[in-house]
């Protein structure tokens, strides 16, 4: 059995655990395979979001779009998008209504839902670690810190909002290398959008992320920020979308697609 087959077995096993109710962030799971953010909307909102993603490709790089009413994806053909993520969020009128590990019963109330699978920066973390760059939330066993920024996304139709960014502390002498490595993955957010000086992004306290967990920033390290696929959730809130389902931040959909597929 080759390494890709082993990784796909690990991904399938992880999705089975999530289907059975296990909840945990997915960073470091099934290394070598792409992970995705998810936003699911009624069909009447799908075109607005597709246009929003097209106008904001670094924050919302779309890897797949489902047919209306479908709960499957070509990214992992045996998976079920209603059950196979570890944790979901349900949104009503732009407000977080609940977090659930299974949304089948809610999905069944809507016949025309369209899911967007959006690239996730967890995908390039394997390459960072192979280069000897510490990925702090993995080494500390927690979720990646994510922050609302003051960077305004290009609006589309009824949708508008600001970019959410993820942060990884990187040793100052490795920042350029980290940017080169991640820049080879434009389909999963690509190169950083900002380095250092978080206040220029409107972030006043790195110890209090809006999503995820704070991580240690050691002497000689610089906070480096990437566009984040939680941006659609900020857009749902800002635009007061009547109904949506999303992944919970850090709790991704693990695909069967190798990371290398998105490497350029």
From Swiss-Prot:
Transmembrane segments: none annotated. InterPro entries: D-Glu_cyclase, Putative_hydro-lyase, UPF0317. The keyword Lyase applies. Its EC number is 4.2.1.-. GO terms for molecular function: lyase activity. It holds the Pfam family D-Glu_cyclase. Keywords: Lyase. It comes from the Bacteria. PANTHER family: D-GLUTAMATE CYCLASE, MITOCHONDRIAL. Belongs to the D-glutamate cyclase family. This is Putative hydro-lyase Psyr_0498. The lineage of its organism: Bacteria, Pseudomonadati, Pseudomonadota, Gammaproteobacteria, Pseudomonadales.
